[in-house]
Amino acid sequence: MKKTTTLLGICAILSAPAFAAQLTLQKELVPRVINGEFVYPEWISDNNSIELKDGENQLAVTVGQIVFEDGKRRKFDSQPLLLEFDAEKDAELSLTYKTFRTIEEAKAFELDPKVVLKDKNGKEVDFSMVQLRKGGLQGFRDYEREVADYNNAVNKQATKSSIAQSPAVTKTLKESFNELSREEQQEFMQWAMRNLK
């Protein structure tokens, strides 16, 4: 019996999953999309933290905070902020921002959003951030689609910039062709015609 208990204990320890990186968000920060996937409420723990994958992460968050406008309380919902950062295995990160009380402070945040990403030792972690601006009703937004559209637009820009660099390659190819002898040029042209798509 003692051996069985010991064996079960060892198996439990060995089969326990490795700890993943965790990100704890300030309570007013709402995670919307993590690494291209919609964040379901059950993914968020009681202390407003979510699990991250090791390595590169992309997170879309919004700020949902009560502010004062003309002496009345009102809910302010920000445009989504899309952050990209690296998380090491077992990292414990926190994401915060300076809370605001008035609608004027909220509008100032909207124009120039600032958030802070720190590790468990309080050291700031590098990240990049863009604000996804879209008009219309904020309550009916498809955050997952907006992030996908943004990522596609960024990929298209990268493709365009690589295409823009290709004239230099073409110029080099032309120069190399001109340096070939007449026979080598004819051989190259025959090869090119055979492989023409």
Curated annotation (Swiss-Prot):
Keyword annotations from UniProtKB, A to Z: Signal
Signal sequence bounds: 1-20
Top-level taxon of origin: Bacteria
InterPro entries: UPF0319
Coiled-coil intervals, chain numbering: none
Family from the record: Belongs to the UPF0319 family.
HAMAP family found in the cross-reference section: UPF0319
Protein name: UPF0319 protein VP0761
Species, as recorded: Vibrio parahaemolyticus serotype O3:K6 (strain RIMD 2210633)
